[in-house]
A protein has these predicted regions:
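N-terminal Rossmann NAD(P)H-binding glycine-rich loop of SDR-like oxidoreductase domains
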Residues: 4-24
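Active-site Tyr-X1-5-Lys
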Residues: 131-156
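Conserved C-terminal active-site "lid" loop/helix of NAD(P)H-dependent oxidoreductases
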Residues: 199, 236, 258-301
Length: 319
């Protein structure tokens, strides 16, 4: 078994990852500013901030990990004025890279970036072709460049797409909550394909990447389920689990009006209205990534779309 340091292990993906790694008897340490969402793993938590290099170095020195999974980041889209608000995604990454460069015993590091290094309707020609839609995406671009240019250790950069499942929060928790209350409507004549990922499959993929022989690895991966899901089919599955009926479809015009209203409410101070023009555009736009290299490495995923929906809705009903 291995010693694995997870930065940001109290977050959504990190919570599920720490749980799975511990269940396999790895020695896991979660370095995070926040307490674990799953209180069973409070004993695995060290409070610390990746922006505090001394704290971070002390953690590495005392734990002396074999592997590192760097998930810690600011992930909201609220900052619109200055990229300095996303210092964790820039200076924080620099701190992690600098420290791991001094630990030659660390076998491999996974750095989590984001699909938002490119806007949803942009198809990059390579992994270093960027088109970020906002400051968050821009901060993740800078973070990737720091890793690629400064890391002198073995690493893989992963870009989680739209991940959902137990312990999730905004925005996909909002999607499930909206479907649950019969307030989610699919636009008529819009049924896009989406490269989304159930979090337990994402954890499976991360672990495959972490422990795979070096010769089997690519330098970058999008983390997503495959094949891409059908949005209507997925929404219907969620609605059936909560409400015993399929989701409704309505014309596009009311949704456009609702999204404009959401934009206005957001400007007036409502942090998270159910629908905005940004979310509506994301909803109706195809988002499909090339998963050939990921499929070759990971093979069949452990959870089907239906199984993921059942697990997630059951968790929501009980939490």
């Amino acid at each position: 078994m291995s010693k694995i340091l997870v930065t940001g292990g109290s977050g959504f993906i990190g919570t599920n990852l720490v749980d799975d790694l511990c269940s396999k008897n790895h020695e896991v340490l979660n370095f995070d500013t926040k307490e674990p969402r799953n209180k069973a793993y409070t004993k695995n938590w060290v409070k610390g901030d990746i922006l505090n290099k001394e704290e971070l170095l002390a953690c590495f020195t005392s734990f002396n990990p074999d592997y590192v999974i760097h998930l810690a980041a600011r992930t909201d889209l609220d900052e619109t004025k200055s990229i300095a608000g996303y210092a964790a995604n820039i200076q924080g990454v620099q701190n992690v890279v600098d420290i791991i460069n001094t630990f030659p015993n660390i076998k491999r590091t996974i750095y989590a970036s984001s699909r938002m290094v490119c806007r949803i309707d942009y198809v990059p020609i390579s992994f270093d072709d960027y088109c970020p839609p906002n400051l968050y995406g821009e901060s993740k671009v800078i973070g990737e460049k720091i890793v690629n240019e400064k890391a002198n250790h073995e690493f893989v950069i992963v870009r989680p797409t739209s991940i959902w499942g137990p312990y999730f929060q905004i925005p996909y928790r909002t999607f499930f909550d909206t479907v649950r209350t019969n307030l989610f409507f699919i636009p008529k004549n819009h049924n896009p394909k989406k490269s989304f990922g159930f979090v337990n499959n994402t954890v499976f993929q991360i672990e495959k990447i972490l422990f795979a022989p070096k010769e089997n690895l690519e330098q970058n991966y999008y983390l997503t389920d495959y094949p891409a899901l059908d949005l209507k089919e997925w929404t219907d599955m969620v609605s059936m689990e909560f409400n015993g009926k399929k989701s409704a479809e309505i014309p596009m015009l009311p949704l456009k009006i609702a999204s404009k209203t959401g934009d206005l409410l957001q400007k007036l101070g409502w942090k998270n209205p159910p629908l905005t023009t940004f979310r509506l555009n994301n909803l109706i736009t195809n988002m499909v990534y090339d998963t050939q290299s990921l499929e070759k490495l990971c093979g069949k995923l452990p959870y089907s779309l239906k199984e993921g929906v059942v697990i997630t809705t059951h968790w929501m009903k009980n939490n």
